[in-house]
Amino acid sequence: MIVHRIIPSRVKDPLTRFKPLKNLTTSSSPVFEPSSSSSSSSSSASFSVSDSFLVEKICFSLKQGNNNVRNHLIRLNPLAVVEVLYRCRNDLTLGQRFVDQLGFHFPNFKHTSLSLSAMIHILVRSGRLSDAQSCLLRMIRRSGVSRLEIVNSLDSTFSNCGSNDSVFDLLIRTYVQARKLREAHEAFTLLRSKGFTVSIDACNALIGSLVRIGWVELAWGVYQEISRSGVGINVYTLNIMVNALCKDGKMEKVGTFLSQVQEKGVYPDIVTYNTLISAYSSKGLMEEAFELMNAMPGKGFSPGVYTYNTVINGLCKHGKYERAKEVFAEMLRSGLSPDSTTYRSLLMEACKKGDVVETEKVFSDMRSRDVVPDLVCFSSMMSLFTRSGNLDKALMYFNSVKEAGLIPDNVIYTILIQGYCRKGMISVAMNLRNEMLQQGCAMDVVTYNTILHGLCKRKMLGEADKLFNEMTERALFPDSYTLTILIDGHCKLGNLQNAMELFQKMKEKRIRLDVVTYNTLLDGFGKVGDIDTAKEIWADMVSKEILPTPISYSILVNALCSKGHLAEAFRVWDEMISKNIKPTVMICNSMIKGYCRSGNASDGESFLEKMISEGFVPDCISYNTLIYGFVREENMSKAFGLVKKMEEEQGGLVPDVFTYNSILHGFCRQNQMKEAEVVLRKMIERGVNPDRSTYTCMINGFVSQDNLTEAFRIHDEMLQRGFSPDDKF
């Protein structure tokens, strides 16, 4: 009889005074020695007269139920074990008695593959599948024992033990359960080469596991061998192979496969439909998914909760939220009750859209139907409110986690900590972190990174360094993001030496360096004007085959232009163009700044006009940079012309406070205070609020003309607008 399922034996051991075979497997002492050449040959090859006499004595003692059998077992060797079991082939009670007594008296007996195989056959025939599997596991885990030796041993003892093919089913299942799938496949191939038949249930276990870990080609090889062997497949086989096609992205072959198996009398069931609907939904092929779903009733199947959940999730993931709500309503009309998975999909999509009203509506509906939200639902809600800055609501949902009988995990805590860090409430974030640890919830790298980012943003580098040291002491390995956060923090404070030390630490620890890390360092050294180090960092990045991004080029070009290295900036520009990287508005503005700082505002204007002709759309900074450049060159007519061009030609670009301040500065420097006064009034009329720099410039202009009356008038206006003068006044 073919055994389809491994279950603990219900057969009672006739000798209850003996310990069961599990004693053989629980011993921690080594019980095997390397297999000798005799272990894979016939037991009679080196079977002596004394061994034969010993076997007779053991068999006689077993039949008589004598207690002195132990005295005989002490002289036993593996070949004699095999011979005893051969003699017991027609009396399984004696065979079991022998196996149990051997295990009880000599748990460390040095078995060979042959002796274990004979025991396995007897135990399988006796229905003691759990004990047989224990013996198989011992054989499988033996060092230096190949699949060929195991299969040969089972084969050579097969007939003499009166065994059946269910032994080989058990072998395949044991490999699968031990997660030794490559070995299971090899054993299956060997068994088929010897003409043994493996049941479809064991084959399903093998191909199902192969598909699950992505070894689809091996699974198809087993399936084809099953088909050749004439073993009848069943609907489980069908579903496994349909899943294999879906997993391999070969959806177009499903129809042909189903036609082939239906010719064999095997037809799809509801699992088949759900598998295909899930595959189509995950790829966003929703029309195909709906077509299958609508076809189900005609085949005698009703879409269930799993079916609806799959479709709703697919619609949500591919941005079709309104359609997902329609399917949800249809689900309710069909009498099905949504579960937490249903609501999770809707909540996550509503949260992603940032729709607070809709999200709360879905959550409220969920609670009204007595569906308990899971941690993912709560984390989605909390994430929505922390992103929008509504920490009170986020905290309310955090407390609801506990009220629902759930234990907040590190994801839940990290979301709330991140919200407080964004608000600059570091002390509250740290209190939450302490609560998290007290609750036995371990911090991971993401949690540390979140707090580190908050500390660095608040320029609390000392605290950040302490937290980083704590992280490493807890044996948590920082990732590239961790160190990039710290590098950025030190760069922003001008601690470039500390930043470089962290960068070197990344290299020493072989932490993956990415373009973000390099960009951070480039920006830090570029802003302090250390062009040589910036170029060294660039060269190091390129040598490691890390491709610069448009941001990388923008940082380097800006650094070069800020120092007036226009020729080098153009070399970088040309390299960027040669790599088909389209210049960004930031890069163009940097080039314009380079011209202006070199005293060539006219060339900067020509550059801007050329870029506009090539489709570049300038922004306020583009014009402001040029206007300031012409003001520095005391070319006020050009500066005014650009303001007019900015307003009229570009449509939508409105002069801002920097634009007006640049013009004011030019007039004040030339002692043209009437013109400066006109610009100030026009600025206010157009709704552009002057800033402290505006008033300071005007006051200094009047003071330079010894016009203290006007200077004090502007000073009073400045105070009325809430600005305080600086120390220079």
Swiss-Prot record:
Residues 27-45 have a biased composition (Low complexity). PPR repeats lie at residues 112-147, 164-198, 199-233, 234-268, 269-303, 304-338, 339-373, 374-408, 409-443, 444-478, 479-513, 514-548, 549-583, 584-618, 619-649, 656-690, 691-725. Gene3D superfamilies: Tetratricopeptide repeat domain. SUPFAM superfamilies: HCP-like, TPR-like. Coiled coil: none annotated. It holds the Pfam family PPR. Keywords: Repeat. It comes from the Eukaryota. Residues 26-45 are annotated as: Disordered. NCBIfam families: PPR. Belongs to the PPR family. P subfamily. PANTHER family: PENTACOTRIPEPTIDE-REPEAT REGION OF PRORP DOMAIN-CONTAINING PROTEIN, PENTATRICOPEPTIDE REPEAT-CONTAINING PROTEIN 1, MITOCHONDRIAL. This is Pentatricopeptide repeat-containing protein At5g01110. It comes from Arabidopsis thaliana (Mouse-ear cress).
